[in-house]
UniProtKB/Swiss-Prot annotation:
HAMAP family: MoaA_B
Keywords: 4Fe-4S, GTP-binding, Iron, Iron-sulfur, Lyase, Metal-binding, Molybdenum cofactor biosynthesis, Nucleotide-binding, S-adenosyl-L-methionine
Residues binding GTP, per UniProt: 17, 71, 102, 163, 266-268
SUPFAM superfamilies on file: Radical SAM enzymes
Pathway it works in: Cofactor biosynthesis; molybdopterin biosynthesis
Matching InterPro entries: Aldolase_TIM (IPR013785), Elp3/MiaA/NifB-like_rSAM (IPR006638), MoaA (IPR013483), MoaA_NifB_PqqE_Fe-S-bd_CS (IPR000385), MoaA_twitch (IPR010505), MoCo_biosynth_MoaA/MoaC (IPR050105), rSAM (IPR007197)
Protein name listed in UniProt: GTP 3',8-cyclase
Gene3D superfamilies registered for this protein in UniProt: Aldolase class I
Species the sequence originates in: Bacillus anthracis (strain CDC 684 / NRRL 3495)
Amino acid sequence: MKSVTLDKLQRPLKDLRISVTDRCNFRCRYCMPEEIFGPDYSFLSNDKILSFDEIERITRIFVSLGVRKLRITGGEPLLRRGLPQLIERLNKVDGVEDIGLTTNGSLLKKFAPDLYKAGLSRVTVSLDSLEEERFFYLNGNRSKVQRVLEGIQAAAEVGMKIKINMVVQKGKNEQDILQMAQYFKENKHILRFIEYMDVGNYNGWELKEVVSKQEIVDMIHQVMPLERIEANYAGEVATRYSYIGSDEEIGVISSVTDSFCSSCTRARISAEGKLYTCLFASKGNDLRELLRSDYTDEEITDVVRDIWNNREDRYSDERLSNSNKKAMPKIEMSHIGG
């Protein structure tokens, strides 16, 4: 019988997102703006981030508590040296049923074959525009679109399942919604639109910059009619729509206008080993200290279970009602991978 660990709102622990680095080769303005994360920014030193042994150990502990799906994140996870070896090790952990990776795609062409051989079956690529100048601006002048598209193609050629994530910001890239939808419909990859969220502390988020799920769907539906379809599984964050008369689909992740806190089953481990129970958390619990002490697996398991049992995060549900309250500092998305 599979273990089930529930929080105070009866949400099970099923998914673990593991950040393997806090570094990124992009400077996307909603995530790691150049003016904050510049040449003098102090990233974690190698001795501060979890080793592969520690990541494998913590994975086994979370699996014993009910986790079945892993997602490797960053920063940009493909900057972590030897990542295919980690994927291979995690793929052998008894109880792990699925491993995914989120990447900006700029290094994917190089690593796709080794990642697939290691057991990585699916990848999510962040891509906010197909327009060259706009994409270059949005990523902090770090990469051209073609480099990312070549990475997507390389992943497809080795057999990976691919999803594309587009963060939509009013006044920045909402004019690219239709072009993105058409392109990835033709290329048979699922495109997911993400409402611009108030993650971290430095992106200057304002509600007026959010393009809502309904606006996105209406815009596409006028040109390529859509119909809503059922979720693949309980707790899926994206609302799914298929193109009428086609097998292709899109998804919309609506953390702002139609939150899904009630079904959130995700825990997040930062690169230095802190456990966060919400994407918008203001503080985490230090598991690295336990991993590097004389704590046994059983003792760490008890600590993690207690943290999850006491979880009652529902930030997105409360966002608008708390809009006039003083904002608490939040963990940076670049630190825990979204």
